[in-house]
Swiss-Prot record:
Gene Ontology terms describing biological process: ribosomal small subunit assembly; translation
The keyword Ribonucleoprotein appears for this protein: yes
TM region(s), chain numbering: none
Database matches in Gene3D superfamilies: 30s Ribosomal Protein S19, Chain A
UniProt protein name: Small ribosomal subunit protein uS19
PANTHER family, sorted: RIBOSOMAL PROTEIN S19P FAMILY MEMBER, SMALL RIBOSOMAL SUBUNIT PROTEIN US19M
């Protein structure tokens, strides 16, 4: 279910404040966050966020294509080990 347009996108206040401060001081630093639920705003483009995936922080560099998505979409929480390999059965000679 989509979020109501009148409510606007959800972004944690501390993220907006940190990015605004960085824009004012013309700084580029990695912003460490646990807020996977925050929506990426146009002001975030060009900045790097370290998004927690439950175990470690994954660096996410924000581009224009990411605007409107959530930060958590770019920090996968599960590792895929691959499917088990199918064992080859040796064929009997002459068959």
């Amino acid at each position: 279910m989509a979020r109501s347009i009148k409510k606007g996108p959800f972004v944690d206040d501390f993220l907006v404040k940190k990015i605004e401060d960085m824009i004012k001081t013309n700084k580029k630093a990695v912003v460490k966050t646990w807020s996977r639920r925050s929506t990426i705003l146009p002001e975030f483009v060009g900045h790097t966020f370290a998004v927690h995936n439950g175990k470690k922080f994954i660096p996410v560099f924000v581009t224009e294509n990411m605007v409107g998505h959530k930060l958590g979409e770019f920090a996968p929480t599960r590792t895929f080990g691959g499917h088990s390999a199918e064992k080859k059965v040796a064929k009997a000679p002459g068959k």
